[in-house]
Every structure is written in structure tokens, then in C-alpha cells.
Amino acid sequence: MPPRHQLFVDMSAALTGFSPFQLHGTGMTAAYLTELDAILTEDLVDQLLAAFPRAVHGSAALEPGAVDALLEDPAWGPPARAITLMWYCGTWTRLPDAWRAEHGVRDHDTDHVVSTAAYQAGLQWVAAGAHPIGARQQGFGSWSFPVEDLAS
């Protein structure tokens, strides 16, 4: 795996709380990095990856508060939060106008679903112990289970 791709996965693992192995299992790592490059430009993505704490890039443990510091950073917090949402929901959320004015982005920076595969691979489903509605079957024999009473 190219070092840049590995840096993106390492940063994403810290942002999402999922391991690099789990993120690779979604099949979305390359697609999300490509999406990010299409929105921010490769140069801005490289700056973001460079801003991410160095400890995560090696075998050393991430310093406590490092992720919070990145999320709260005025320069890199907005794209870091958008990346986190992309992993969980399979959607890109448009960056704030002030950030866009300062850093510049491409026209692709709009609220949008990255792809149908991204929706299905969203970490929200794993976190909730659910399946993507309308995209995956519930499992063999699920038709035989009684309908859940939503009133209770």
C-alpha cells in the first residue's frame, strides 16, 4: 500500500475508532481517498495528513487528546469531521463557507452520497448492529420472526 494511502487509513482509524483492518474490510479506503482528493485537492489532503499527529503513523500509541486537537483545529477540524461522517454515513458534508473561502476547494464539495457502495459500507451500520436499509437482506428466515411492536 502506498505510504499516502496508509497515512489516510491511520488517520481514519483514529477519527472513527475502527481499526485499519476494519476500514480495509469496508472496501472503501481507496474510494474515500480518491473522493477526498477530488474535493480538497491532493495538496490540501497531503497537508491534512501531515497535520495529523505523527505518533499514529508508526507503532507508537496515539497521544491522549490528539484526535480532539485535530477535530478542534480551525484549519483541519472541518475536513476531519467531514471525513469521519463519510466513513460512518457514506456521505460527504459540504465544508463551511469560511473554510472554503480560506483554503479553496473544488466544485465537488457539495452534500452528496459518495456512492451506493459507500452507503452500504457505512460504519453506522456496524456501530448500530444493523444492516443498511433496502440494501442487504436481513438474513435467512427473517420473514418468520414476529413483527416488532413499535408502540412499546
Q: Which positions does each model-derived feature cover?
A:
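Short, compositionally biased low-complexity segments
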Residues: 4-9, 49-58
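Short, charged/polar micro-motifs that form catalytic or ligand-binding hotspots
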Residues: 1, 18, 22, 34-38, ...
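Basic/polar N-terminal segments that are highly enriched at the extreme N-terminus
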Residues: 1-3, 152
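Amphipathic alpha-helical segments that form the core helices of the histone-fold
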Residues: 27-55
